[in-house]
Amino acid sequence: MLQGKQLILATKPFAKENRAKSWYYTISTLLILIASLIGTVYNFHWTLKLACSIFAGLVIVRLFVIYHDHQHKAILDKSPIATAIFTLFGFYVLAPSGIWSASHDYHHKNNCKLFSASIGSFPIYTKKKFEKCSKSERFHYLFIRHPLTILFGYIFAFMYGMCIKSMINRFSKNIDSLIALILHFSYQIAVFYFLEWQTWILLCAIPHFISGAMGSYLFYAQHNFPSVTFVGNEEWTYEGAALDSSSFMKLNPFMHWVTAYIGYHHIHHMNSRIPFYRLPEVWDAIPEMRSAKTTSLKPKDIIACFKLKVWDYEKQKMVGI
């Protein structure tokens, strides 16, 4: 049975992209998104426009995961064309590459450490720490983890968390966050002015709301689920954080397509250089990966994840308050 660093080494053969496949999935997903967005404006009936709007929100999630893989240098690395495409996409979804790369790289190196800064992830307090907090500190902590905050991830995670907060913290290092906000709101104002508010709702509001909510929840649930394990900095290991603190999300084939296999999150955390389309290969090839801790998008699992608030050190599990 493979353990520890042996597991990481076992994944290395899969950390090689098929360049043609990477381009195919990138371009095809981009074209599907463009077609869906066009369908929100030009269509036979408002119900078809609404269907295109909802589907566009889901496709944005897929393209975001592909963008995320490019940021990890798992696909299309050193391609100027790919870099240009994904830079523009990062502006479009309010996740510019500068702050996204910095915060997400930190997340991978510190995933599920109890006593690290909550950069690029949802904060985790121990039960004792929470009890010692002031009312305002408790409110802030619970607000960040609240279901409504995650539902409105477009505003709180992306618009504020990725862009506004990054500029407040370090403006000189995050000029691209300002560019993202300017471009993002310029295109929305143009749509609202020239195509009217009904089109703005279908072309802009619904797709961004759906993708923001789903993206935020996926990121939350993949590290905040009932059987998750958190450890101190001294006990932390990279492979342990992947297997014990990152979930496998059980999804149907369509939702695996929408999420570009990011539900195989424990494998992604074991080796972030594995292209998204090869994650199922690792699942099939390495038996140890199939013993992952799981969650899903079923209502009971979503409720179970949202009930988790603090880490109980004595019980060694996440609990409610």
Listing of model-derived features with the role each one plays in the protein:
Residues M1-V59, I66, T83, G90-A205, ...:
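Non-catalytic, topology-defining segments of multipass membrane proteins
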Residues S216-F254, L297:
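Membrane-interfacial segments at transmembrane helix termini in multi-pass membrane proteins
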